[in-house]
Design a protein with these regions (language model features):
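Thiamine diphosphate
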Residues: 1-142
């Protein structure tokens, strides 16, 4: 499937071989790992902004749940680790529960609100500033 957006999106220099694994580290944490953000598509840009603002946060881009689940358990464990998970996805949270059952979720399970992209991100709390504040509290980061 080809999925397009009306929004301007940053090219994160994705490697096709990595994408074909279904999930991979797109941003490596600075310092000791404290948490892992799971995201996909255009939300990865916001996830990286959050991770750049906090030490110890890794961003994993999930390109395909089915392909990721087919990878060896050792690979999946290396990518996800046992650290707390944060899910950032402007769609349903449903697909992420098996990876982040006790995680912090920034998702949209309600639809029908109209507005510009900026207005909707603000309404749903999907701005780097709001997310950073909640992630700090969730991970008990000063």
């Amino acid at each position: 499937a080809l999925i397009l957006s009306k929004e301007k999106v940053t090219n994160n220099k994705t490697n096709l071989d990595d994408a074909m694994l279904g999930g991979y580290i797109i941003y490596k944490e600075k310092g000791k790992l404290k948490g892992v953000i799971l995201s996909s598509g255009m939300e990865v840009e916001t996830a990286i902004k959050v991770a750049e603002s906090l030490d110890g946060i890794r961003v994993v881009s999930i390109t395909c749940f089915e392909l990721f689940d087919e990878q060896p358990k050792a690979y999946r464990n290396k990518i996800l680790t046992d650290k707390p998970k944060i899910v950032m996805e402007l769609s349903s949270s449903y697909s992420y529960y098996k990876y982040a059952s006790n995680g912090l979720y920034f998702t949209t399970d309600k639809f029908g609100k109209s507005g510009s992209s900026t207005e909707l991100r603000e309404f749903y709390g999907f701005t780097p500033e709001k997310i950073i504040k909640k992630v700090k509290k969730f991970l008990k980061i000063e």
